[in-house]
Amino acid sequence: GLEDVYKRQPQYLVIEDRFPNGRPQLEKAGVYMTDRDTVNKVERMKVTTCLNPLHTALAVYGCILGYNLIADEMKDKELSELVRRIGLVEGMPVVTDPGIISPEKFADEVLHVRIPNPFMPDTPQRIATDTSQKVGIRYGETIKAYVEKEGSAESLTAIPLAIAGWCRYLLGVDDNGESFELSADPMAEELKAQLDGVRFAEPSSYTGQLKNLLSNANIFGINLYEAGIGDKIEELFVEEIAGKGAVRATLKKYL
């Protein structure tokens, strides 16, 4: 019923505590009052690790696999496992910890409460909008952190799958070989042009068309070949264009 709409727990409202003339005790309502640096860390935790990267992965794969509601994707074994790994497995070792909220607890609640909530009318088509402007923050920051920490991001699998999924999405062909309309993106025409010649169900039609995109630090924040995952993303992409059901088969293979 209607009351379920208001059960959008968890709600994390984090506000900078700068009220020169005093303020009500917002903490009693569950609001986190803190300094600006901590507010920024909470935001970074969300957009680079615990929430936004998961949304983008669900958006591009949701379009390819025929979903119209993000919440429904969490009932999908492969997609729910993909975002679990992006957030809890690959994101956590390099997450920004704001101190006032546990990143693990936040990500767990995102996975089990927030995204599966059927009263959140998010569609993959809407969230896939402007993905070229988002991947640098949503994936690039974690990739850069791995390079800084381990010298390479080659240990990653779920994040390369998400990026390969975006590249596959750019073909505008679903996993059954049917065309779909790409969501609005300022780079849409340029990106489609870079994929020129790549054809669904013809893996041999791929002759390196992704190299310019995957090496573009303006998009990802880092050259993905220098990060050690460019070749892996190309290989995943080729598997995902192999024919009907190839995207599903690729997800099953690597998750």
Where does each model-flagged region fall?
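Short, small-residue-biased leader/transition segments that mark boundaries at the very start
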Residues: 2-6
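ABC transporter nucleotide-binding domains
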Residues: 17-18, 24-25, 200-202
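Active-site-adjacent bridging/hinge elements
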Residues: 20-39, 61-62
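Conserved phosphate-binding loops in nucleotide/dinucleotide-binding enzymes
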Residues: 39-46
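Conserved phosphate/anionic-ligand binding catalytic regions in large, soluble enzymes, centered on
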Residues: 46-62
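C-terminal catalytic subdomain
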Residues: 61-190
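C-terminal amphipathic alpha-helical interaction region
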Residues: 156-255
